[in-house]
């Protein structure tokens, strides 16, 4: 097998996020520590202290969030972890916060439709990623002494067979160029969700309304595609 393009050019992003309107109103909040020092901005849904939303039980990111919460001293800073119960409820908590213009702080990932609908700022963990620490402790249920760490990076590539690489010709030329930033994918997923569209509908919407694909094909193919649209 061979790697072609890194299809998510921003990688698959995971981490802790806050609404963009909170970030805009509080430009001093750039890191996880900054947010944890502003418990007043992130009310707990039960009205007692501040909240940080983790992943639902059974998701590995819950272990990582819980361990990083301990590493950064979240409880001592007035926060309690909220388990949303499901991926849908986690997304719903973001939508509800946006609807009320309230603070929200917690785990999410990109690209996703939710981040296409509700602009969010990913916060820095303000330390380099330590992969050994991540594998031995940050991501483990029995992590006794978690240390500060940055979230692991998830690279996402298109992979092709040896035969495809050797025989596909212009198909391979296309595959090695096809990559999109997460903001574009977020927006496309949000459009697809809002319009209850099919994958084919979303592809046509992309071709008609975005220009990233222009660099994936030669000028002749581009002209034919535009004429067909």
Regions found by a protein language model. Give the residues of each.
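C-terminal functional modules
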Residues: 164, 172-229
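A bilobed periplasmic-binding-protein/Venus flytrap-type ligand-binding module shared by bacterial periplasmic
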Residues: 13-25, 154-167, 190-191
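Ligand-binding pocket segment of bilobal, Venus flytrap-like solute-binding proteins
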Residues: 53-134
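A conserved helix-loop-strand patch within extracytoplasmic ligand-binding domains
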Residues: 1-53
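C-terminal lobe and pocket-closing loops
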Residues: 114-179
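Extracytoplasmic/secreted envelope proteins and their assembly/folding machinery
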Residues: 32, 36, 62, 66, ...
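Sec-exported extracytoplasmic/periplasmic mature domains
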Residues: 37-41, 70-74, 95-99, 176-180, ...
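Soluble non-cytosolic domains of exported or imported proteins
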Residues: 10, 25-29, 56-60, 84-88, ...
């Amino acid at each position: 097998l061979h790697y072609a393009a890194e299809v998510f050019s921003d990688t698959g992003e995971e981490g802790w996020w806050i609404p963009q309107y909170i970030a805009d109103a509080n430009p001093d909040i750039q890191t996880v520590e900054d947010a944890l020092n502003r418990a007043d901005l992130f009310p707990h849904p039960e009205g007692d202290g501040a909240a940080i939303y983790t992943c639902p039980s059974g998701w590995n990111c819950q272990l990582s969030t819980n361990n990083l919460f301990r590493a950064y001293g979240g409880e001592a800073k007035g926060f309690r972890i909220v388990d949303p119960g499901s991926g849908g409820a986690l997304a719903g908590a973001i939508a509800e916060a946006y609807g009320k213009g309230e603070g929200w702080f917690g785990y999410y990932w990109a690209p996703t439709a939710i981040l296409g609908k509700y602009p969010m700022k990913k916060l820095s963990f303000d330390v380099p990623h330590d992969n050994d620490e991540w594998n031995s402790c940050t991501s483990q249920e029995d992590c006794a002494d978690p240390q500060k760490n940055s979230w692991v990076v998830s690279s996402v590539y298109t992979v092709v067979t040896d035969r495809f690489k050797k025989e596909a010709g212009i198909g391979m030329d296309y595959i090695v160029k096809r990559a999109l930033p997460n903001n574009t994918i977020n927006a496309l997923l949000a459009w697809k969700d809002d319009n209850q569209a099919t994958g084919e509908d979303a592809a046509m919407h992309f071709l008609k309304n975005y220009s990233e694909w222009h660099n994936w094909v030669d000028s002749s193919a581009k002209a034919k595609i535009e004429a067909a649209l």
